[in-house]
Amino acid sequence: MNLLPNIESPVTRQEKMATVWDEAEQDGIGEEVLKMSTEEIIQRTRLLDSEIKIMKSEVLRVTHELQAMKDKIKENSEKIKVNKTLPYLVSNVIELLDVDPNDQEEDGANIDLDSQRKGKCAVIKTSTRQTYFLPVIGLVDAEKLKPGDLVGVNKDSYLILETLPTEYDSRVKAMEVDERPTEQYSDIGGLDKQIQELVEAIVLPMNHKEKFENLGIQPPKGVLMYGPPGTGKTLLARACAAQTKATFLKLAGPQLVQMFIGDGAKLVRDAFALAKEKAPSIIFIDELDAIGTKRFDSEKAGDREVQRTMLELLNQLDGFQPNTQVKVIAATNRVDILDPALLRSGRLDRKIEFPMPNEEARARIMQIHSRKMNVSPDVNYEELARCTDDFNGAQCKAVCVEAGMIALRRGATELTHEDYMEGILEVQAKKKANLQYYA
């Protein structure tokens, strides 16, 4: 039993030695190292120890440098944070330049580091009306900047710290309709054809664009609604704004007539720029005849300014860069005095006429405005419609209001047919009376 370990131990020792030799060969230890004397191996070991110490000191130095760089980065980040919290100086980007310096400096010549930078540089104009060249743009990526952008810069170094949102005139921002109107197409009587034409030209291209793409047709850019006063042009525009999810901007023609030269044209530009930013959007211009009259020779500066405002409107309607996501709805009572350039195809493509309501339409209008009232069952709307000849939609609504006031005056709980007849007489008296006042 005791002989087995003595027999196996030499074999095991040889295997271990073979393993050591294999590892030595794998580790790249040459035969010359194995043939070295003890003193040489001790000397080699001391050399390796010294190299290890040198490498450790190098690692320690690199670690210190890394920590110093981290501290510097932290300090710079805090400086940037402090600078960014300061009030910005508002500026506009005038131009972006590509800088590629030529290496033609003589040996020993002084070299300006700013002049040797490569990449993008910027020219800005501050709100203090000063222009600066920035060899280093700042914290904003140069690829995200374009001429005309509004930026915030440091008031001392003028480095660009942040891009600011586009500035629009406060009057243009007030034109945006925040609260949706409550009118619906069912609240409009006698204008079924006009509603269909408006939906086809404005609503369908926004909600179902693929239908036009499948047919290969281009939808109309704008709609002109014209007709006598009180026929429902503005009411239909409010219903269109309520039924679409697009941004709705309401302009009035007299708003665009300003005292200072170029102010009206700037309002038009800002309105269309805001509409493009918030596309899809609808611009409704009421009383277009205030600025869209035919051009004529005039020596008055006011007339020329109105014509310049109309020219800017023409350019925005059919400019060099058309936008299919912005639709224009214009309304006017005097289509006969509009400039032919506004009426041509390509600007206000579809013209929708709003005629005076016929007998059936007048009956429908009075039914719509009376549906929330306590009306007696004996009210005959067809007879009322026959009695309201030459009434427009607004006057038919006024008849319902007057009938309600008459019923309220006599303390009734419901409106009768006679109340409506008296209301018709009241509206006719207001319509036909010719009052003259004497001092």
Swiss-Prot record:
Gene3D superfamilies: 1.10.8.60, Nucleic acid-binding proteins, P-loop containing nucleotide triphosphate hydrolases
InterPro entries associated with the record: 26S_Proteasome_ATPase (IPR050221), AAA+_ATPase (IPR003593), AAA_lid_3 (IPR041569), ATPase_AAA_core (IPR003959), ATPase_AAA_CS (IPR003960), NA-bd_OB-fold (IPR012340), P-loop_NTPase (IPR027417), Prot_ATP_ID_OB_2nd (IPR032501)
Description of post-translational modifications: Sumoylated by UBE2I in response to MEKK1-mediated stimuli.
Residues recorded as bearing N-acetylmethionine in the entry: M1
Entry superkingdom: Eukaryota
GO cellular component entries: cytosol; extracellular region; ficolin-1-rich granule lumen; membrane; nucleoplasm; nucleus; P-body; proteasome accessory complex
GO BP annotation list: blastocyst development; modulation by host of viral transcription; positive regulation of proteasomal protein catabolic process; positive regulation of transcription by RNA polymerase II; proteasome-mediated ubiquitin-dependent protein catabolic process
PROSITE patterns linked: AAA
Keyword field contains Metal-binding: no
Binding site for ATP: G227, P228, P229, G230, T231, G232, K233, T234
Membership in a protein family: Belongs to the AAA ATPase family.
Disorder noted: Deafness, cataract, impaired intellectual development, and polyneuropathy: An autosomal recessive disease characterized by early onset of deafness, cataract, severe developmental delay, and severely impaired intellectual development. Patients later develop polyneuropathy of the lower extremities, associated with depigmentation of the hair in that area.
PANTHER family: 26S PROTEASOME REGULATORY SUBUNIT
Name of the molecule in the record: 26S proteasome regulatory subunit 6A
Organism in which the protein naturally occurs: Homo sapiens (Human)
Gene assigned in the entry: PSMC3
